[in-house]
């Protein structure tokens, strides 16, 4: 199993030339082959950046995706109303005055309207390219299956999927097939991103799910069973499980600690590494870590991707030592609270800020664990 003491969630800031090329491709001004050349070059560069920073775990920065969760609808037919706001909707908040709050409406036509038909893999090609360009641990991120629960609509989806459970069964099957293929290709570390669980600490988001007929306890139980069905499809593979509170354009969705969800999630999910958000007071304290089973590692997301603030090795080590009062030091790691760019709309920091933060994580891990 992967035991690295330095990790980052996955997404990295897209360089301006890649974003410009994506826009030109969408406008029909750039041939797909030329875009692929630019995209491949950007991925090679971001791999080199992580290696130079000392990262033992590397990703492709999610550079080939519109959003961390967009590959399901990009690779599988059957959805309608999908645009960038499908991944950005919600009431977003910021602690920085110049960023401010923002509300993005859910696309009104967003729904599954046909039976799912897989056209290509979600991440197998990403992994193959990544593995061929690094000798570090190559990590692939995938969305938790129940992130897509909101795409089932009792009216618009009923012809394709009269029952919600039937839709979710197909989503789970797609993701199970994907992790099996990743495992076959040699992937040793995959991560499920599950930001929808911490949303349940917020009354408004609880009401959203309860309006669909689920109590919080029922929803957590259902979701964890779905996650475990995906994780259990690839025995021997290390799985990370990332839990944050929303991260987009340096904004967040909810505030509060993990207290209300820690027992069912930390103890119930079959993941080997829990990547948790702990970069500010909004994230709550370390007390819920006492509920982490002894066979799991915790990646403390102490380094923020939302602001340029330069964390120091001293402060990070102090917080790691504090967490070690609840979880054995050897089962801890240090990382980011979330990605640097969970969609093509990245956080409001510079590429230099990103590099410095990755270097600080690697140096801190070396200082604490050797």
Spans of model-derived segments:
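Domain-level signal for soluble alpha/beta catalytic cores
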Residues: 1-370
């Amino acid at each position: 199993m992967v035991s690295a003491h330095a990790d980052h969630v996955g997404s990295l800031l897209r360089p301006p030339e890649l974003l410009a090329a994506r826009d030109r491709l969408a406008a029909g001004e750039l041939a797909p082959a030329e875009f692929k050349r630019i995209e491949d070059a950007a991925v090679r560069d971001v791999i080199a950046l992580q290696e130079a920073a000392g990262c033992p775990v590397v990703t492709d920065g999610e550079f080939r995706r519109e959003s961390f969760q967009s590959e399901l609808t990009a690779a599988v037919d059957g959805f309608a109303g999908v645009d960038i706001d499908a991944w950005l909707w919600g009431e977003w908040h910021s602690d920085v005055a110049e960023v401010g709050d923002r509300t993005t409406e859910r696309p009104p036509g967003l729904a599954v309207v046909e039976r799912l038909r897989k056209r290509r893999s979600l991440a197998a090609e990403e992994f193959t390219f990544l593995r061929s360009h690094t000798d570090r641990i190559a990590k692939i991120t995938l969305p938790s299956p129940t992130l897509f629960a909101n795409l089932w609509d009792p009216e618009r989806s009923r012809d394709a999927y009269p029952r919600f459970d039937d839709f979710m069964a197909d989503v789970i099957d797609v993701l199970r097939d994907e992790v099996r293929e990743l495992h076959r290709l040699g992937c040793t570390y995959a991560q499920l991103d599950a930001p929808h669980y911490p949303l349940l600490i917020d009354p408004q988001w609880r009401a959203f799910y309860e309006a669909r007929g689920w109590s919080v306890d029922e929803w957590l139980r259902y979701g964890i069973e779905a996650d475990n069905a995906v994780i259990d499809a690839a025995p021997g593979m290390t799985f990370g499980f990332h839990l944050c509170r929303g991260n987009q354009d340096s904004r967040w969705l909810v505030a509060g600690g993990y207290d209300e969800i820690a027992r069912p999630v930390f103890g119930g999910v079959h993941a080997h590494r829990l990547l948790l958000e702990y970069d500010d007071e909004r994230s709550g304290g370390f007390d819920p870590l006492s509920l982490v089973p002894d066979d799991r590692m915790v990646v403390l997301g102490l380094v923020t991707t939302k602001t340029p603030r330069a964390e120091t090795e001293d402060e990070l080590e102090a917080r790691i030592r504090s967490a070690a009062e609840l979880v054995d030091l050897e089962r801890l790691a240090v990382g980011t609270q979330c990605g640097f760019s969970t969609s093509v709309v990245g956080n409001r920091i510079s590429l230099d800020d990103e590099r410095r933060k990755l270097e600080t994580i690697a140096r801190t891990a070396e200082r604490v664990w050797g």
